[in-house]
């Protein structure tokens, strides 16, 4: 987390803008962006953050979530990272000359998507006061879609977690899965330890290789009823409208896809 502020701001209470970067929630970093002109012209504090991405940021598996309680039952780890950063800002930003009662979250593409998901999340209520979603969207996945618990889901999305682990049999996944399915109570903790032992780099490389050959999307935001509304972001926005009635700007950036045209072989 970085805080960027105007000169001589410590004794002031400036508006706070909290930036969530884009990148499909699979890539990107806070350091790509220069907000110096925004800060100079408008006298605001800008907070930029990193958060977990890809399968390390969103990973649904019953051997992990099924054995947990409370927040540990959610697979939306990246969403929790953003919420924790907001909590820290709300508590501490006054020490940097920011107003904890005037926080605007804003993001572009996947960042805009995350803005909308935070508007719909009960866990983020009261942590910000305005929101800007640039080229955001409301896509989310059911737990079954994210895990790939039936054949229809597997055929529709090669990047469902069970399908990835099964296809590539990372560290002997098939063997421990069979034991777990035969007796979930007995082998649940063993299964969980196995999953936690998988090398993070190997997991990322596996997803990267599969992504080259498919237009499937990595199941990112999962409708778990904890960090994300059980019926998805759109339903969550409708449900949160009365509770979280704050100013919102939502739109599409004109040149959103221009960056990708150069690499499109068609």
Model-predicted segments: where are they?
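Short beta-strand-to-loop junctions in surface cap/lid or active-site-entrance loops
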Residues: 1-12, 22, 232-242
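Proline/glycine-enriched tight loop/beta-turn segments at coil->beta junctions
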Residues: 6-16, 28, 100, 241-246
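Cap/lid segment of the alpha/beta-hydrolase catalytic domain
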Residues: 10-12, 20-83, 91-95
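Glycine-rich nucleophile elbow surrounding the catalytic serine of serine-hydrolase chemistry
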Residues: 25-26, 107-117, 257
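Mature extracellular/periplasmic domains of secretome proteins
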Residues: 35-39, 119-120, 237-239
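Alpha/beta-hydrolase fold nucleophile elbow
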Residues: 89, 96-108
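Substrate-access "cap/lid" subdomains that shape
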Residues: 91, 116-117, 125, 134-266
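A short, hydrophobic beta-strand element of the alpha/beta-hydrolase
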Residues: 105, 132-134
